[in-house]
Structures are given as structure tokens and as C-alpha cells.
Design a protein with these regions (language model features):
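Conserved catalytic-core motifs of GNAT/GCN5-like acyltransferases
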Residues: 78-81, 130-132, 146, 150-169, ...
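Conserved GNAT-fold acetyl-CoA-binding loop/helix
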Residues: 27, 31-54
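C-terminal "cap" of GNAT-fold acetyltransferases
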Residues: 162-205
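A short, internal acetyl-CoA/4′-phosphopantetheine-binding micro-motif in the GNAT/acyltransferase core
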Residues: 95-103, 131-136
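A short beta-loop-alpha structural element at the N-terminal edge
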Residues: 14-26
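Conserved GNAT acetyl-CoA-binding A-motif
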Residues: 119-144
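Conserved acetyl-CoA-binding loop-helix of GNAT-fold acetyltransferases
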Residues: 104-120, 143-147
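Acetyl-CoA-dependent GNAT
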Residues: 45-91, 95-101, 113, 118, ...
Length: 205
């Protein structure tokens, strides 16, 4: 059952494709994750120019979706290559970041549902999430991200132990995956996000 607060958010929130000019505002969402958490293993906040380049590079092939309400960007999600080799083409890695104070309201689910639908339109068959994972929850990292992905249907598939060092402690990393379709011989070619019919994309926003 959808709570009143979540219902109100879903009624007022709008999704759209990110634009390079969103870089500065999106970076304000991302920066606290770098500076205050181990959710991302980056040490330094990227520059606006670097973040803009990341958006532009992603949009060459993959979706980069932002959630907006009243002109304010509340979060974003995107996919990218799982690996660069051609045989991995039907798998994509997911990322999602929600603005501080906006978690627990259904925003993450809304963004991921759009990403999943678009990925199906692209003929992507696997969504893979690389998730920072603590042995024990601490002030920098909890197991919430893994639990969020599990609620969306992602399955745990593997773990790397003590592979990342941040804030003076070691963290694990887990992989979770969501299968989007049957893995047939001679699968349909993957369609770049920029080549999808924009009208079809807008319908799911």
C-alpha cells in the first residue's frame, strides 16, 4: 500500500533525461556521498566539468534520468557498460543517487523503474549493481543499498572482501543482478539510448 507521503511525491515528481547543463546541480547531490559516506569509493569530489563529461559520455549509449519537482533536482539514476568487451554488451551497470532528505519516499523506486523499462527497450538483458557493503553498519556505510536493490528484485551474486579502503577502514563490495529477459541464442542487438524513439521514452517518464 502506498503511503500518503509517497503518493504525494509520485503525483508531483517528474522524470526526464539529464542534460549536460544539469551537472552543477547533480554534483551537489553527489558530493555528500563522496565526502561523508563510503557508498561511493571516490575520494575527491569531481569538478563540474568532469561531471558534465560523465553525463555526456553516458548519454552516448545509456540512459541518464533525473527526478525533478518544482524545478529542483531530487535524484538521478543511470546505467553504463558492465565491462567494455563486446560480449558483455547485453549487461549494464546501474547507479543511483538521491538527494539528502529525500530518501524513503519512493523516489529511488521510481527512478529505477524508468531505468529498467528503458533498458528493456534497449534489449539489455542484465542489470548489475556494484554495491559498497560493510561487515557491520557504521557511520559511513550501511546495508541499506543492498536491501533496497533486493526489494526491487535484484539477487545477490557475489562478494569481494576488503577491496576498498576509505575513512581508515576496509569495505567489501557485492554484486547484485536483475534479469530482464530470456537469454536466447542470437539475441537482439542492443539499441543505444540516443537511438530510441524519444516519444516512447517520454511515455514512461
Amino acid at each position: 500500500m502506498i503511503g500518503k507521503e509517497e503518493k504525494n511525491m509520485n503525483e508531483t515528481i517528474k522524470l526526464r533525461t539529464a542534460r549536460p547543463d544539469d551537472a552543477e546541480e547533480l554534483l551537489k547531490i553527489y558530493a555528500p556521498y563522496v565526502e561523508n559516506t563510503a557508498i561511493t569509493f571516490e575520494y575527491e569530489v569531481p569538478s563540474v566539468a568532469e561531471f558534465r563529461a560523465r553525463i555526456e559520455n553516458t548519454l552516448k549509449k545509456y540512459p541518464y534520468i533525473v527526478a525533478e519537482r518544482g524545478g529542483e533536482l531530487l535524484g538521478y539514476a543511470y546505467t553504463g557498460p558492465f565491462k567494455s568487451r563486446a560480449a558483455y554488451n547485453w549487461a549494464a551497470e546501474t547507479s543511483i543517487y538521491v538527494k539528502e532528505g529525500q530518501k524513503g519516499l519512493g523516489l529511488g523506486r521510481k527512478l529505477y523503474e524508468a531505468i529498467e523499462t528503458i533498458s528493456r527497450m534497449q534489449n539489455i538483458l542484465n542489470l548489475n549493481a556494484c554495491i559498497a557493503y560493510p561487515k557491520v553498519d557504521d557511520e559511513y556505510l550501511t546495508k541499506n543499498s543492498a536491501q533496497f536493490h533486493e526489494h526491487l528484485g535484484f539477487k545477490y551474486v557475489g562478494e569481494f572482501h576488503d577491496c576498498a579502503y576509505k575513512f581508515g577502514r576496509w569495505y567489501d563490495m557485492i554484486w547484485m543482478e536483475l534479469s530482464l529477459g530470456e537469454h536466447m541464442a542470437d539475441p537482439a542487438a542492443v539499441v543505444a539510448f540516443c537511438d530510441l524513439d524519444k516519444r516512447d521514452v517520454e511515455k514512461i517518464m
